[in-house]
């Protein structure tokens, strides 16, 4: 279909041309004046639509109505769990945290719930259970860490004390090897020098031996003592 550009432009010009002013110059005539831009022209706004008209299938309309329901359409609401149902599900979860197909069907029949709803509840309950287990594990590890930290601090303090003792002993050994030791008291400080002292017991023994020998030698040289001791006395 061929379109005439010239004819369309002329139609638009004609459509938007202002009409002639009325003969009456009264101001009231303007209120009763009706302007029709499409007067005398076959051009209408509906003629601007080009291309084929796309019709939406009924199936898509139904899906859109289900996804985006309006006030007139009632959506199937999720059934809430009662306290008895929650207690039964909790007991079943405490017995076994994993849900198999047979137990799911059995619970759905007993509680009157959909199997999908039971599966979702078990999935959420397992997630909460795992989070609780992680919290408990964190608390226990935190307590163990605090105990180990305190023990480490105690060992560190003990090592510092032992190092101080070793340092003092090293200083004492150095002073002993140098020959002087300073002993600090409450009132004064005494300096002791290392002096080599001879054993007096050995000197005493040597002196006694020499003295005894002199006594024997003196008795042997004294004739009075020899005579008196060797010959008997006569009356």
Swiss-Prot record:
Source organism of the structure: Arabidopsis thaliana
Name of the molecule in the record: Putative homeobox-leucine zipper protein ATHB-51
Keywords: DNA-binding, Homeobox, Nucleus, Transcription, Transcription regulation
GO annotation, biological process: bract formation; floral meristem determinacy; leaf morphogenesis; positive regulation of DNA-templated transcription; regulation of timing of transition from vegetative to reproductive phase
Location in the cell: Nucleus
Free-text function comment from the UniProt entry: Putative transcription factor.
Cellular component, GO annotation: nucleus
InterPro entries in alphabetical order: HD, HDZip_class_I_plant, Homeobox_CS, Homeodomain-like_sf, HTH_motif
Region (Leucine-zipper): 134-162
GO molecular function: DNA-binding transcription factor activity; DNA-binding transcription factor activity, RNA polymerase II-specific; sequence-specific DNA binding
Record bears the keyword Lipid biosynthesis: no
Pfam family for this entry, one: Homeodomain
DNA-binding residues: 74-133
CDD domains: homeodomain
Family according to the record: Belongs to the HD-ZIP homeobox family. Class I subfamily.
């Amino acid at each position: 279909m061929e379109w005439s550009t010239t004819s369309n432009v002329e139609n638009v010009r004609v459509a938007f041309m202002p009409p002639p002013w009325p003969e009456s110059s009264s101001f009231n005539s303007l209120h009763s004046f009706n302007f029709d831009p499409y007067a005398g022209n076959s051009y209408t706004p509906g003629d601007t639509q080009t291309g084929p008209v796309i019709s939406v299938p009924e199936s898509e309309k139904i899906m859109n109505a289900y996804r985006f329901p309006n006030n007139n359409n009632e959506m199937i609401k999720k059934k809430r769990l009662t306290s008895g149902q929650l207690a039964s599900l909790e007991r079943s979860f405490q017995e076994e945290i994993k849900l198999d197909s047979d137990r799911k069907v059995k619970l759905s029949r007993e509680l009157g719930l959909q199997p999908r709803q039971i599966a979702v509840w078990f999935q959420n309950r397992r997630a909460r259970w795992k989070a609780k287990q992680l919290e408990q594990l964190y608390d226990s590890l935190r307590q163990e860490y605090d105990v180990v930290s305190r023990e480490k601090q105690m060992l560190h303090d003990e090592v510092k004390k032992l190092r101080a003792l070793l340092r003092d002993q090293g200083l004492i050994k150095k002073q002993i090897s140098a020959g002087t030791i300073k002993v600090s008291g409450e009132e004064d400080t005494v300096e002791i020098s290392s002096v080599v002292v001879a054993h007096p017991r050995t000197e005493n023994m040597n002196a006694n031996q020499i003295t005894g020998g002199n006594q024997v030698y003196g008795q042997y040289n004294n004739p009075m003592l020899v005579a008196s001791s060797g010959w008997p006395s006569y009356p």
